[in-house]
Amino acid sequence: MHASLTRQTVPWEAVIAIDGADPTRLPAPLAADPRVRTVVTPQRVGAACARNLALNTVRTEFCNWADDDDEFEDHAMATRLHILKETGVGWCAGYSQDLHPDGSTSLWTCPAPPGRHEAGDVWTYWKHPSDTIPIGPTTILARTDLVRAAPMGGLVQGEDYMALGVTNLAPGILLPIPVYRYRKHPGQMTKQATYDQLEAASREHAWNYGRSLSAALRSGEALAHG
């Protein structure tokens, strides 16, 4: 991840959430980079909690969740930042690619179609909890205030599904180009033997959250307009 960040063409900062681990194990290139800061929890609290605590320290106008074993495309930040600045939407996303051990990639085209989406529209492309999520959470660059309003939730896995909540809070644009590479390897969480035990429940919780959030916001708008 860090190597891909160094190839970005716009300024950036990174906050690394270290979940109860020894911070001295941080690789030397990251520890030496002044653009990288860490938030260390004194005990293991889980990815969702650790990431939410790290979010407290974000200083940039826009924010993008990411996993340390994945990569951004070289143009990812500049392309989406340009859209955000030019259009004034709250978020901008793209497609992702699976990065396989042999270095090859395969494109994942998300269910939501490319183009502009009004607040709440993206969730309509997630018809059932077991269906494919409508947009890749780590492909979304969004205003930091929106990310703080719809963060990672408290799930022990699938916490990134909750991050899709930002699409209910403001209009956004989905670009039909890959911006993120999701590295496939045996050590990833989704490959662990226990992963399936909570996957269905995590999906259902996130799905209900998004639908309820969208409904509540639309109800509030209706009341405001009489």
What are these regions (language model features)?
Residues 2-12:
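Short, acidic, metal-binding catalytic loop of nucleotide-sugar glycosyltransferases
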Residues 41-58:
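Glycine-rich, basic loop-to-helix element that forms the pyrophosphate-binding segment
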Residues 63:
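Short aromatic/hydrophobic "clamp" motif used to bind/position activated sugar donors
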Residues 77-108:
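Conserved donor NDP-sugar-binding/catalytic core segment of glycosyltransferases
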Residues 95, 110-132:
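Short, flexible, basic/aromatic active-site loop/helix in glycosyltransferases
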Residues 95, 173-179, 183-184:
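Catalytic beta-strand/loop signature of glycosyltransferases that borders the donor
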Residues 120, 182-185, 191-220:
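Catalytic core of nucleotide-sugar-dependent glycosyltransferases
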Residues 156-162:
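Acidic donor-binding loop at a coil-to-helix junction in glycosyltransferase catalytic cores
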